[in-house]
């Protein structure tokens, strides 16, 4: 009975669908609209994840002279700022869209402000807690990168575009965490004091973010055609 129920020829529909899906994914990664957002996902989204999860506490303890309790307070303020920013985006997002404000415009404004605030963290003597709270607030702009990139693709590909950006973000978080650590170890071995090494590392991330920001200032291209979508 089982043998009689088996098809005479192998079913290739599954293989074809997998191949088609892979072509679509490859098309997303190769699309200019995705590439202009990819570096920002790596160094803004991934960079924030790396700072939030690993490097904020060593920075404020060694550069700003905070104790562990003070560093924990800064970390809480950073996350509360991010929460407030996300709530603001959720509350105002629909209203701004109805007013004709595009996600890419919010992304440009948010990332531009993030660059300024991080430069102030690095070089100014302004209150530390205020700056990190403001930085957390502005990181809510990261959510706009998904909407901005997806606008250039068919609506059916929103999930795949978002997944591709998430992949870039997590790769960026790992690369920034790992690269920051390797750079610090190298500079410490060269005799650079820890505070200066941290400043060089943070400055390097800021420079990479600046380069990642520039493609977002370009012309928004028409909707891409990817694979069969």
Language-model features: locations:
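Juxtamembrane intracellular "pre-TM" segments in multi-pass secondary transporters
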Residues: 7-38, 63
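Extracytoplasmic gate region of multi-pass secondary transporters
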Residues: 32-90, 150, 173-181
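A membrane-interface helix-boundary motif in multi-pass transporters
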Residues: 67, 182-208
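Intracellular juxtamembrane helix-capping segments at the cytosolic ends
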Residues: 141-154
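A late C-terminal transmembrane helix in Major Facilitator Superfamily
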Residues: 152-189
């Amino acid at each position: 009975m089982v043998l009689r129920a088996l098809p005479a020829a192998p079913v290739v529909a599954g293989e074809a669908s997998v191949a088609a899906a892979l072509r679509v994914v490859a098309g997303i990664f190769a699309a200019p609209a995705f590439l202009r957002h990819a570096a920002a996902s790596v160094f803004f989204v991934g960079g924030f994840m790396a700072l939030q999860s690993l490097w904020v506490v060593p920075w404020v303890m060694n550069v700003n002279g905070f104790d562990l309790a003070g560093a924990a307070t800064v970390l809480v303020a950073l996350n509360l700022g991010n929460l407030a920013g996300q709530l603001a985006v959720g509350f105002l997002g629909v209203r701004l869209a109805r007013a004709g404000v595009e996600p890419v415009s919010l992304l440009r404004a948010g990332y531009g402000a993030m660059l300024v605030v991080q430069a102030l963290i690095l070089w100014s003597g302004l209150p530390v807690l205020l700056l990190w709270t403001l930085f957390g607030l502005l990181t809510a702009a990261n959510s706009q990168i998904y909407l901005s990139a997806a606008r250039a693709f068919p609506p059916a590909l929103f999930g795949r575009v978002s997944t591709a950006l998430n992949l870039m973000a997590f790769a960026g978080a790992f690369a920034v965490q790992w690269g920051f650590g390797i750079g610090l170890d190298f500079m410490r071995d060269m005799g650079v004091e820890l505070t200066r090494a941290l400043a060089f590392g943070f400055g390097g991330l800021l420079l990479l973010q600046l380069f990642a920001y520039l493609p977002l200032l370009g012309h928004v291209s028409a909707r891409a055609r990817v694979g069969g979508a």
